[in-house]
Regions:
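Rossmann-fold dinucleotide-binding core
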Residues: 208-305, 406-442
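Rossmann-like NAD(P)-binding element
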Residues: 65-72, 139, 147-151, 157-216, ...
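NAD(P)+-binding Rossmann beta1-loop-alpha1 motif at the extreme N-terminus of oxidoreductases
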Residues: 64-164
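Structural motif
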Residues: 3-4, 112-114, 141-143, 179-183, ...
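N-terminal chloroplast transit peptides
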Residues: 1-53
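NAD(P)-dependent Rossmann-like dehydrogenase/reductase catalytic/cofactor-binding core
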Residues: 61-97, 256-259, 317, 325-581
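Small-residue helix-packing motif on alpha-helices
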Residues: 153, 174, 190, 272, ...
Length: 581
């Protein structure tokens, strides 16, 4: 990753991957696997090799203070604050409406911010930026750029952006006329259109991304960004509707929103860090932490296929089927899976952490939790490990690009858009449960459900930790985004309402990986429990003493000042997911 420094702005990254200035690159060699002398390599499956590596990965509890990337940064406008997470020093910038008067200074040189796209993030970010800049009495124009003929023009007009006011227009005119271009179209569309986008950008303008996907795509082609523009990222740790909803809810409490990471990939004139931080503050981020563009896309694409979307979908499907097969009635099974995870379990983790979920159980409940946790941890990590390496190798990125092209007819084959994911019996039962749910009901705390879910959460934390991600990124991608931003949407109206309010990349990944978690839990974890296999006490001990719990306590103090409210008839979600009652 190319991190440029200047006198006004420096970024010290721990172990970035530097891209050559030009020319194709040799793909990295595949990771080698050594096999025991007694076992021919051809007889050791990839899954078995992963399981062996996984076992080595968690054979001892994580040490406090083990090496993690250094992500210090310099800002001339905002106050940088040092926090300690599990013995690691990191730096953040706290947000708040009281900082809005600083936005004109931080955005110095920016006369127009072009927001390109109107999907999940586009509407939220455009409206938040517009409202924050207006409160700061700034004359910076926020303009929406859409392709001609797009149905989103009407949605943008309804949100107050118009051609007459110069705040809505053609995508290419908007790119050419903007000093800061926020590229919020789908990842697949970015991959297919980046050359034209780059060619329309002004020299010394700033490209803003809310996901590092494009970097991963360029890396896979041996390419990089143009050298005459700055490249930054601000990545809210939640779907677009959450970004807007919490911003609106928090107007009276000094600004609430979604935590964001930021990265400076290229800085051509020393302004990039302050512009990125201003963008994040204007979105309403309670706190902003540093990452690299490469670390962001790896953790984000991986995370949404894991506990954020795909894995939690797979878990509740597997548990619902297990509970009903064991004789539990369907409504109780739904309550003890979806309602419990998105309700009492998420609420407890959000406010008090994972250990509080465990400590609130009875002695018998703790035994059941331990069985579920012990049996589920390694199977979940097996799939998570595979998923992370698919993302890091570029395989998952290529999958997203190709899937986007299959949305349209080509080569004589029909179009294959994404299908529904909430039409099975389980989700119809969920509709009935929600129709009679008392207001504020958080569902039951089922110890087996809690054990499986928290095993998944801890397995994801461990993968990201061993892959060198910072604790702020780990906790946001594995815990905070899940319980504070995404699960409330499934609680409100089921799995599709959660998944399909997210980006196309997230929606595709969730559909692809959810069945993998369902399968491995059913075929490995639950079978282990039913055989009454001994509990792995080392896993339980490691969970109880893991330093991540202390880091989560620190991050809990930086959470949004209000809890998100997601009514079933929410009007701040994707138009196709709205309902009248």
């Amino acid at each position: 990753m190319a991190a440029q420094t200047s006198a006004a702005s420096t970024l010290a990254f721990g172990h970035p991957k530097t891209l050559a200035a030009a020319g194709p690159k040799t793909p990295p060699a595949a990771a080698s696997v050594s096999f025991p002398a007694t076992q021919p390599a051809c007889l050791l499956s990839a899954s078995a090799a992963r399981r062996r590596d996984v076992a080595a990965m968690v054979s001892a509890p994580p040490a406090v203070g083990t090496a993690m990337p250094s992500l210090d940064f310099e800002t001339s406008v905002f106050k940088k604050e040092k926090v300690s997470l599990a013995g690691h020093e990191e730096y953040i910038v706290r947000g708040g409406r009281n900082l809005f008067p600083l936005l004109p200074e931080a955005f110095k040189g920016v006369k127009q911010i072009g927001v390109i796209g109107w999907g999940s993030q586009g509407p939220a970010q455009a409206q938040n930026l517009r409202d924050s800049l207006a409160e700061a009495k700034s004359d910076i124009v926020v303009k929406i750029g859409l392709r001609k003929g797009s149905k989103s023009f009407e949605e943008a007009r309804a949100a107050g952006f118009t051609e007459e006011s110069g705040t809505l227009g053609d995508i290419w005119e908007t790119v050419s006329g903007s000093d800061l271009v926020l590229l919020l179209i789908s990842d697949a569309a970015q991959a297919d259109n980046y050359e034209k986008i780059f060619s329309h950008m002004k020299p010394n303008s700033i490209l803003g991304l809310s996901h590092g996907f494009l970097l991963g795509h360029l890396q896979s082609l041996g390419l990089d960004f143009p050298k005459n523009i700055s490249v930054i990222a601000v990545c809210p740790k939640g779907m677009g509707p959450s970004v807007r909803r919490l911003y609106v809810q928090g107007k009276e409490v000094n600004g609430a929103g979604i935590n964001s990471s930021f990265a400076v990939h290229q800085d051509v004139d020393g302004r990039a860090t302050d512009v990125a931080l201003a963008w994040s503050v204007a979105l309403g981020s309670p706190f902003t932490f540093a990452t690299t563009l490469e670390q962001e896309y790896k953790s984000d694409i991986f995370g949404e296929r894991g506990i954020l979307l795909g894995a939690v979908h797979g878990i509740v499907e597997a548990l619902f089927r297990r509970y009903t097969e064991q004789g539990m009635d369907e409504e109780s099974a739904y309550k003890n899976t979806v309602e419990g995870i998105t309700g009492i379990i998420s609420k407890t983790i959000s406010k008090k952490g994972m250990l509080e979920v465990y400590n609130s159980l009875s002695e018998e409940g703790k035994k059941e939790f331990n069985k579920a946790y012990s049996a589920s941890f390694y199977p979940c990590m097996d799939i998570l490990y595979e998923c992370y390496e698919d993302v890091a190798s570029g395989s998952e990125i290529r999958s997203v690009v190709l899937a986007g092209r299959r949305f349209y007819e080509k080569e004589g084959l029909p179009a294959f858009p994404m299908g529904n994911i909430d039409q099975t019996r389980m989700w119809k039962v969920g509709e009935k449960v929600r129709s009679t749910r008392p207001e504020g009901d958080l569902g039951p705390l089922h110890p087996f459900t809690a054990g499986v879910y928290i095993a998944l959460m801890m397995a994801q934390i461990e993968i990201l930790r061993k892959k060198g991600h910072s604790y702020s990124e780990i906790i946001n991608e594995s815990v905070i985004e899940s319980v504070d931003s995404l699960n409330p949407f499934m609680h409100a109206r089921g799995v599709a309402f959660m998944v399909d309010n997210c980006s196309t990349t997230a929606r595709l990944g969730s559909r692809k990986w959810a069945p993998r978690f369902d399968y491995i839990l059913t075929q490995q974890a639950f079978v282990t429990v039913d055989k009454d296999a001994p509990i792995n006490q080392d896993l339980i001990s490691n969970f109880m003493s893991d330093p991540v719990h202390g880091a989560i306590e620190v991050c809990a103090e930086l959470r949004p000042t209000v809890d998100i409210s997601v009514p079933a008839n929410a009007d701040f979600v994707r138009p196709e997911l709205r309902q009248s009652s």
